[in-house]
Amino acid sequence: MNRLQCVCAAAVLVALPALCLSLPARAQEQYQFESDLLAKRQLFRDVAAGFREIHRGPNGNYYVLTAPAPAVMIYDPSGKRIGQVPSASAAAVKGAALVYGQSFDVDHDGRVVVCDRGAKALKIYSPRGDLAATITMPAPVSVVFLPGDEFAVASPDTDHLVTAYDLEGKIVRDYGDREEIADRADVNTQVNFGHLVADEMGNNYFSFDYLPEPTVRKFDRVGYLALEISLKTLEFAPAAQAARKAIARMGESERIVPSLHRIISAVGVDPRTQELWIAIGTLLMRFDKDGQRLSSFRTYLPYGARLEPSQILVEPDRLLIGADPQGIYEFPKPEKLPH
């Protein structure tokens, strides 16, 4: 075995069918290659510091959230700003404007749902940009739309990782087991911070921001666990061990304020193929729909500086990768594996 083969290790895949019956873990083939991925250009140049998320909505328009900002901005495919949510007139209504948006999503009809951390609420807007409903929630972190006029929310203060609501704000189900790895409740709360992405079939993917072993769980549209990718091999072991030692030190004294190191920076999913893209710092990994690692890259800006993604939007022919404060960049979407 050559030295390059020894350096890279494969992820351990744990797959569960819809009824959550455990299957034997399947080790992936050893991964041997890591390539540079260079951004082509910067998009939406007025978006930089405070960037949170970008999503594609109806008519090919792009919706962009920055914080703090009173609204989600809408751009046409050419990059021209054409509107906002809430609309300028609707924003005058009490409680309609955003205080500090953390996450959002837009559906095929143009409805928008926002995790407004500053208002401690979820806000649902109509396609016209009017505030349709507000759901009080102490710490909404991430949100995605699901089929059937539902949306899923991740919040570390709930009993499960994900809670699904209808458009009227009624809870329809919750799912996803929390990770309890510390003696202190406040540390476990931070460990269960996570972000959601979803594909066209309604599968939703929860990525743990702070769990020492990089972990992403795939749930089907009704909440059954379908797949777990947990990276526990030599490539990731030193960072995981350091994170667990830091958590153990926090357990020694209640006076230590929990401050964990972010593990997974961003996750994106191809809405059609269900390929998953996971970023850990500047390392960007591509997985097929079964959780097999296909390729690895290091992300760079056009002038050569490294970029640590905070969001990945997967499109048919490109990747849109955003970061705070650098902004949003277009990256090529490699079609062939490195040789």
Give the location of each predicted region.
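N-terminal secretory signal peptides that target proteins for export/translocation
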Residues: M1-C6
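Bacterial N-terminal signal peptides
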Residues: A9-C20
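Boundary at the C-terminal end of the N-terminal hydrophobic targeting segment
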Residues: C20-A27
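Eukaryotic scaffold repeat domains enriched in small/polar residues
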Residues: A27-H339
